[in-house]
Amino acid sequence: DTACSSSLVSVHMACQSLRAGESDLAVAGGVNLNLFPEEFISRSLAGMVSPTGRCRAFDAKADGYVIGEGCGAVILKRHSDALRSGDNILAVIKGSAVNNKGHSYKRTGYTGQSQQALRKKARKEGGAEPGNAGYVAANGTGSYLGDPIELKAIKNVLGQGNPSERSTCWISSVKTNIGHLEGAAGIASLIKAVLALQHEGIPRHLHINELNPQVSLDDSRLAIAVERQPWPRSGKSRLAGVSAFGLGGANAHVILEDAPSPVPRPGKVDRP
């Protein structure tokens, strides 16, 4: 249990198990149900929930998160095994990482240095070049103080990119679409990123009119996806980063890559 990063941490742990040969198939995910009014009351009294009922992640008027319900799960196998079995591969996990900065964590603000270290660790593991990232499924909760810290961390790691290739890297948060699923938030972001790869388009980030004044993206290759953005397949792999940060300081980051083109399989022949 790492709070809001739990489901993405489960994906990371499943990947470790597969790499170590402890398992051949894993199901990772999370679920969040709000069954008791005390959950709403406590979060409201703590000033965590948006009084307007809108998650305005990265917006100048961000005022808290919106509680959501949902569940999600993914089936994971080693890439070589999935290819050999002829499975329908939706995406490839190129790298993943987890870290913890609980001793310096504050409820209203994440630690930017730990986020940068986390993203660099995941990219180093997967051998992913920062300039190849085309999409970031950010944590983006709607925190006026926490959101710009995350954007600055993303900018420091991905903002400059490869000098010879400065294609835009789009940012959005699934919490503006379906609310904050807390323990299941990470898997929701992961599934959204997989769908973006599959459908060759980055979904629109909602409820943003003006970027939080504490951060600027003008001098970087980063941009908020205020409209749906086409993300077609090209000659090189497309990469997406997925982040989830837990209330106690446990952070998780997963890097996704294009699924390989499906190999045509001979159809069944009707026999008389």
Predicted regions and their residues:
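Condensing-enzyme catalytic core of the thiolase-fold
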Residues: D1-P272
